[in-house]
């Protein structure tokens, strides 16, 4: 009997968490949808409809550089670098490499461009700068939103991170950017810095590299890092899946091993629906 009480407590806790994760999925899904609609309206307003992919990227950079006056926050602690309504509207965030890159990436995605973040790493593998990669004509070219520039050579050809590992091309590209800090070089780069996690980081990266080669090239990882609404929606969906599977396992144990009567959700919903829609009998 004691084990049955423990099981029942676990069963009801699982049902409660399943309900909460369902509510979380619905609310964060609505949040993410509203953010996407906001970004779509924003990008439609600043990017001409018939623009080529490169023109779209350059139009976004031009808006970041020469757009309308931005708000000034007296206290930036209340701003989020992962909320587009903040990164697109506050000058302080558009002056920081991480949040400026997030603003560029969010507008790029909403305009139909494939874009992802790229971390430039120091020798000890800490991030020293953040830029974006945009997929143009089959190549991932570098856009530095902090300096409002697409990296190009002297002929105007956009450059990839592999190109910028060549000292000559790096010098050509950065010479045309006023105030560029040369230490922001491309010898060591990463899309997601899992290795920075304490203890588990290096192990997790090795496991992911073995199980999912090229996993960090995925655009979804970049979206998780740059948009808070999508990150919460992603976590809510996985919580919903986890608790739903856990409920199925517990239901099987209750029916086939412990022989414990339990609330059958489908049967209860069927009875409730039948009662609601049935015509009352008048005597």
Predicted regions and their residues:
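Secondary-structure boundary elements
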Residues: 27-92
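Juxtamembrane interface at the cytosolic side of transmembrane helices
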Residues: 242-272
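Hydrophobic/aromatic-rich core segments of domains that either
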Residues: 102-171
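Hydrophobic membrane-insertion alpha-helices, especially the h-region
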Residues: 11-29, 239-247
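Extracytoplasmic/lumenal ectodomains and periplasmic regions of secretory and membrane proteins
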Residues: 147-219
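N-terminal Sec-pathway targeting helices
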Residues: 1-19, 252
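Juxtamembrane/start-of-transmembrane alpha-helix segments at the extracytoplasmic/lumenal side
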Residues: 7-14, 218-241
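Short N-terminal edge-element motif at the start of the domain
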Residues: 81-117
């Amino acid at each position: 009997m004691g084990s049955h009480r423990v099981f029942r407590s676990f069963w009801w806790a699982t049902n409660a968490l399943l309900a909460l994760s369902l509510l979380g999925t619905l609310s964060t899904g609505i949040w993410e949808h509203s953010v996407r609609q906001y970004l779509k309206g924003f990008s439609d307003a600043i990017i001409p409809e018939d623009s080529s992919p490169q023109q779209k990227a350059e139009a976004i950079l031009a808006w970041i550089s020469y757009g309308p006056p931005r708000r000034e926050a007296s206290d930036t602690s209340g701003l989020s670098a992962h909320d587009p309504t903040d990164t697109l509207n506050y000058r302080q965030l558009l002056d920081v490499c991480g949040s400026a890159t997030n603003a560029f990436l969010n507008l790029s995605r909403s305009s139909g461009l494939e874009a992802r973040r790229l971390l430039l790493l120091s020798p000890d593998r800490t991030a020293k700068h953040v830029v974006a990669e945009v997929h143009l004509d089959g190549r991932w070219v570098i856009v530095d939103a902090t300096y409002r520039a697409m990296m190009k050579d002297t002929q105007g050809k956009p450059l990839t991170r592999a190109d910028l590992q060549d000292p000559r091309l790096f010098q050509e590209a950065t010479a045309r950017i006023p105030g560029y800090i040369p230490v922001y070089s491309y010898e060591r780069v990463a899309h997601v810095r899992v290795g920075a996690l304490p203890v588990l980081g290096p192990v997790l990266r090795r496991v992911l590299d073995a199980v999912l080669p090229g996993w960090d090239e995925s655009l979804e990882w970049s979206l998780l890092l740059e948009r808070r609404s999508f990150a919460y929606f992603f976590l809510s969906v996985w919580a919903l899946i986890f608790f739903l599977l856990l409920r199925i396992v517990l239901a099987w144990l209750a029916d086939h091993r412990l022989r414990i009567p339990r609330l059958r959700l489908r049967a209860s919903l069927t009875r409730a629906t039948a009662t609601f829609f049935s015509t009352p009998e008048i005597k």
